[in-house]
């Protein structure tokens, strides 16, 4: 298609050729004929290349995100890309029912509860500017025919560092796309708040975090046992948590027994590092004062083993998008309203999303009986979700506030938060303090992400 680079097209074709040999194995991905749509009618990531009928969703722009005038080249301060745009639509308490078909169940729940209090969506023009490196596209094309789920969906075989399932055939494949999404190494200082039922903002955490992504270093080797991310969080507030450290190694392809997540904690009271298997699933997350679970972070993370996953289909939905101004430029304290984030700081766009519904497996335990996810077709990130309690009531809902790291190699970064409709509280996590976000690991080596070095840091 026009605009897709010749290099990219050639690398996709070569990958499809390799993939067609792999595809002869019994459980492989889609047929080479289907996969040939990548880079043609579908983007290299499997999204629909074209816009929608009424033009409210444009065609994908392979040129990538624009560089705004005020951006300093090489800086990690990714200011808003569309500073002169105004909302083209405001969906509020008086008109939301007209737009019901394009709202998530959670957003409808917010209007029902807070529409009269000023909850609204400020909708801006849609910009589909998400791009990835050419090697990532080539690996994605290879994966389309060669990657396959085994071990009851707990493991991917035959995948290279790219999107594992650009043309998903199941809910499990779609959620794996979200779980091992493309990311760049970063380090940041951030504050996490929750707002209690009286409308008071409470600091849950101040911390420094470093995330690196080993899986995307060796671009021409299968993922295998490689780690998707190593994350280390050093806490400095509140006082009772100052000095605590959390370390997580998250797999790139394998959650089978003995594999999967490895987590360690350094607790100042114990003055030692210990394995922390409870840093997973529905354990309340102290990073947000227990207001959501560990597996709520980034809307969903971790092993998919406790749920049945269903791919419901695709829909046009209003979700947060291109929120650089909020994520990188806005002071969080200024955005915290008594019942919800200030609607003036959040940018919404109409997007095509994959809807994935998950229900708790028989015999499994979890606080949530059901969860629904809305996965953006361009980024393959769950931008919104809903969590239901054991009685089937809508309990919590979440949004990711995505931002684009533009420039040399486009990256995806996000903050995220949840609303609790039963307890009337909400939280916001992972938003950098303005000016305190940096690309790269901040000069630390991979040893920094080991229990040994963590123990030394803790003792200091």
Where are these regions (language model features)?
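Long, C-terminal catalytic modules of enzymes
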Residues: 436-460
């Amino acid at each position: 298609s026009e605009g897709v680079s010749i290099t990219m097209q050639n690398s996709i074709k070569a990958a499809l050729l390799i993939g067609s040999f792999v595809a002869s194995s019994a459980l492989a991905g889609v047929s080479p004929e289907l996969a040939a749509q990548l880079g043609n009618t579908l983007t290299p990531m499997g999204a629909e290349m074209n816009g929608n009928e009424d033009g409210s969703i444009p065609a994908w722009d392979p040129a990538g995100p624009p560089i705004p005038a005020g951006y300093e080249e090489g800086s990690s301060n990714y200011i808003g890309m569309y500073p002169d745009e105004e909302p083209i639509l405001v969906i509020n308490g008086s008109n939301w029912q007209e737009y019901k078909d394009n709202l998530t169940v959670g957003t409808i729940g917010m209007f029902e509860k807070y529409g009269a209090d000023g909850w609204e969506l400020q909708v801006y023009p849609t910009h589909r500017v998400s791009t990835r490196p050419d090697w990532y596209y080539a690996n994605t094309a290879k994966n389309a025919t060669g990657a396959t789920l085994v071990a009851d969906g707990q493991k991917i075989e035959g995948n290279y560092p790219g999107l594992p399932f650009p043309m998903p055939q199941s809910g499990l494949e779609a959620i794996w796309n979200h779980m091992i999404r493309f990311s760049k190494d970063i380090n940041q200082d951030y504050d996490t708040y929750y707002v209690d039922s009286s409308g008071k903002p409470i600091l849950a955490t101040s911390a420094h975090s470093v995330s690196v992504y080993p899986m995307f270093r060796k671009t021409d080797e299968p993922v295998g046992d490689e780690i998707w991310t190593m994350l280390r969080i050093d806490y400095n507030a509140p006082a009772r948590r100052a000095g605590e450290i959390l370390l997580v190694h998250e797999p790139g392809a394998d959650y089978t027994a003995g594999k999967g997540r490895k987590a360690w904690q350094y607790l100042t009271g114990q003055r030692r590092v210990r394995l922390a298997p409870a840093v997973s699933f529905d354990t309340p997350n102290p990073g947000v004062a227990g207001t959501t679970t560990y597996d709520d972070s980034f809307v969903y993370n971790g092993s998919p083993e406790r749920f049945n996953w269903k791919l419901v289909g695709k829909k046009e939905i209003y979700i947060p998008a291109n929120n650089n101004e909020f994520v990188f430029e806005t002071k969080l304290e200024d955005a915290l309203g008594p019942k919800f984030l200030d609607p003036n700081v959040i940018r919404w766009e109409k997007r095509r999303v994959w809807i994935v519904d998950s229900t708790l497996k028989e015999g499994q335990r979890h606080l949530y009986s059901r969860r629904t996810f809305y996965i953006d077709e361009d980024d393959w990130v769950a931008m919104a979700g809903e969590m239901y309690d054991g009685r089937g009531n809508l309990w919590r809902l979440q949004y990711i506030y995505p931002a684009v790291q533009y420039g040399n190699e486009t990256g995806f970064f996000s903050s995220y938060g949840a609303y609790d409709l039963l307890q009337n509280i909400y939280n916001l996590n992972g938003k950098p303090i303005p000016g305190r976000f940096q690309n790269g690991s901040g000069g630390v080596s991979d040893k920094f992400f080991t229990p040994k070095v963590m123990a030394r840091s803790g003792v200091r």
